[in-house]
Amino acid sequence: MKIVALTLVAFVALAGASCPYAAPAPAYPAPAAPSGYPAPPCPTNYLFSCQPNLAPAPCAQEAQAPAYGSAGAYTEQVPHYVGSPNREQVQQFHQRIGMAALMEELRGLGQGIQGQQY
């Protein structure tokens, strides 16, 4: 343990002796160049367009008290993007799945036969 401590002290002494003296850093950082952009004004809703001017956008109107809890804001039915498949579509789907499984099985058999030596 004494050897480790002695080695550490010697290393610190050599490192300190080999480094040139540097002036201490200032207590506070030097101020940077002033920014060219001023602080933005208070937030405002703007509509952006191709025109050179900006017009404030109107804020949303206060909603009336909902009659159905949180669902009161919705006025239309929930859209259905995919309908229920009919019997023919279900059969086609099952045929495709069966054909894909059969192809995978045949590929596996083909690779097994190629790996065998006669």
Swiss-Prot record:
Keywords: Secreted, Signal. Residues 1-17 form the signal peptide. InterPro entries: Vitelline_membr_Cys-rich-dom. One of its GO terms (cellular component) is extracellular space. It is found in: Secreted. GO terms for molecular function: structural constituent of vitelline membrane. It holds the Pfam family Vitelline_membr. One of its GO terms (biological process) is vitelline membrane formation involved in chorion-containing eggshell formation. Residues 36-75 form the VM domain. Major early eggshell protein. Belongs to the vitelline membrane family. This is Vitelline membrane protein Vm32E. It comes from Drosophila simulans (Fruit fly).
